[in-house]
UniProtKB/Swiss-Prot annotation:
It comes from the Eukaryota. Signal peptide: none annotated. The gene is RKI1. One of its GO terms (cellular component) is nucleus. Pathway: Carbohydrate degradation; pentose phosphate pathway; D-ribose 5-phosphate from D-ribulose 5-phosphate (non-oxidative stage): step 1/1. Its EC number is 5.3.1.6. This is Ribose-5-phosphate isomerase. Belongs to the ribose 5-phosphate isomerase family. The keyword Isomerase applies. InterPro entries: NagB/RpiA_transferase-like, Ribose5P_isomerase_type_A. One of its GO terms (molecular function) is ribose-5-phosphate isomerase activity. Present with 5680 molecules/cell in log phase SD medium. GO terms for biological process: D-ribose metabolic process; pentose-phosphate shunt; pentose-phosphate shunt, non-oxidative branch; pyridoxine biosynthetic process. Transmembrane segments: none annotated.
């Protein structure tokens, strides 16, 4: 690694094992998958681990050896948070409308199963995240080791499958999820203490969280949910990820790939 881009094994601890794990996963994912000769359009996802993805890419701007190439990267955000991450790290901002074909995308996950199927959307950006990740030739997941399921989705992540819906369809979709798809519990996601009422996405939709317990066939469940009138998108990301990096608190990283 050239001077100016810190070596992973020489990094000082952040003083928080969980943050160390996230940083290790993100830095290694960027270093091993970002190809300077081939990648120009980069998708930047949402969430706490992706903070370190944007940070790592931004570090290449500070190295004279990489500056010329890194300054030409165009980064596509999945929402307001990732837009700010891109700008805060002095990276060039683009949009999915301008660049509908993305070379590589990095994003986090709420849970990853043994087949690299994902639950995403805990941050309420699932439609934009899926739009960016499925537009990318390569999609890399970065997360800490808590997000790795031993087998099925729904084992570790117990908040349910996030589903983005048209606001006026809330009652209809909730009833269909309970009666047709036998969800154990369905809740409309509420805003925090500073905001009364439901969470509103960047696309002015609502988010439902539907608990199906452990999900042995996420592909089938995704198809069934998508057929319900009023559903915009599900937080089940099927056959999308190429590779997942899981950071451990000791700084080591596990890699899962297809």
């Amino acid at each position: 690694m050239a001077a100016g881009v810190p070596k992973i094994d020489a990094l000082e601890s952040l003083g928080n094992p969980l943050e160390d794990a996230k940083r290790a996963a993100a830095y290694r994912a960027v270093d091993e998958n970002l190809k300077f000769d081939d990648h120009k359009i980069i998708g930047i996802g949402s969430g706490s681990t992706v903070v370190y993805v944007a940070e790592r890419i931004g570090q290449y701007l500070h190295d004279p050896k990489f500056y010329e190439v890194a300054s030409k990267f165009i980064c596509i955000p999945t929402g307001f948070q990732s837009r700010n991450l891109i700008l805060d790290n002095k990276l060039q901002l683009g949009s999915i409308e301008q660049y509908p074909r993305i070379d590589i995308a990095f994003d986090g996950a709420d849970e990853v199963d043994e087949n690299l199927q994902l639950i995403k959307g805990g941050g309420a950006c699932l439609f934009q995240e899926k739009l960016v990740s499925t537009s990318a030739k390569t999609f890399i997941v970065v997360a800490d080791s808590r997000k790795k399921s031993p087998k099925h989705l729904g084992k570790n992540w117990r908040q349910g499958v996030p589903i983005e819906i048209v606001p006026s369809s809330y009652v209809r979709v909730k009833n269909d999820l309970l009666e047709q798809l036998h969800a154990e519990k369905v809740d409309i996601r509420q805003g925090g203490s500073a905001k009364a009422g439901p969470v509103v996405t960047d696309n002015n939709n609502f988010i439902i969280d539907a608990d199906f317990g452990e999900i042995s066939d996420p592909r089938k469940l995704h198809r069934e949910i998508k057929l319900l009138v009023g559903v915009v998108e599900t937080g089940l990301f099927i056959d999308n990820a190429s590779k997942a990096y899981f950071g451990n608190s000791d700084g080591s990283v596990e890699v899962t790939e297809k």
